[in-house]
Amino acid sequence: MTALTQAHCEACRADAPHVSDEELPVLLRQIPDWNIEVRDGIMQLEKVYLFKNFRHALAFTNAIGEISEAEGHHPGLLTEWGKVTVTWWSHSIKGLHRNDFIMAARTDEVAKTAEGRK
């Protein structure tokens, strides 16, 4: 468990700061299995989780939906047979905010107990 899993998201307005170049490697070390993807010039955190079937993948997707609603911060979710791709970024600032790292860490926590993981 990391400090990120214990933190809560804060409201993120359009003028909120992006994660700084100094903060980025420190935060990434706390979520080592996540990748940074850049789409349309926007940095995003992304990770693929594998499952034994669609039912387990869908249950995981719904669990991520629950924690997202609780924190008011929502990912991109692609649910396929045996696979869920989770992508975190802050839409309002078009990039990465500390909230994204908090939710990536929380996603990993949910995955630890998710049924049907490969």
From Swiss-Prot:
<dbReference type="GO" id="GO:0008124">
    <property type="term" value="F:4-alpha-hydroxytetrahydrobiopterin dehydratase activity"/>
</dbReference>
<dbReference type="InterPro" id="IPR036428">
    <property type="entry name" value="PCD_sf"/>
</dbReference>
<dbReference type="InterPro" id="IPR001533">
    <property type="entry name" value="Pterin_deHydtase"/>
</dbReference>
<comment type="similarity">
    <text>Belongs to the pterin-4-alpha-carbinolamine dehydratase family.</text>
</comment>
<protein>
    <recommendedName>
        <fullName>Putative pterin-4-alpha-carbinolamine dehydratase</fullName>
        <ecNumber>4.2.1.96</ecNumber>
    </recommendedName>
</protein>
<dbReference type="InterPro" id="IPR050376">
    <property type="entry name" value="Pterin-4-alpha-carb_dehyd"/>
</dbReference>
<keyword id="KW-0456">Lyase</keyword>
<dbReference type="Pfam" id="PF01329">
    <property type="entry name" value="Pterin_4a"/>
</dbReference>
<dbReference type="GO" id="GO:0006729">
    <property type="term" value="P:tetrahydrobiopterin biosynthetic process"/>
</dbReference>
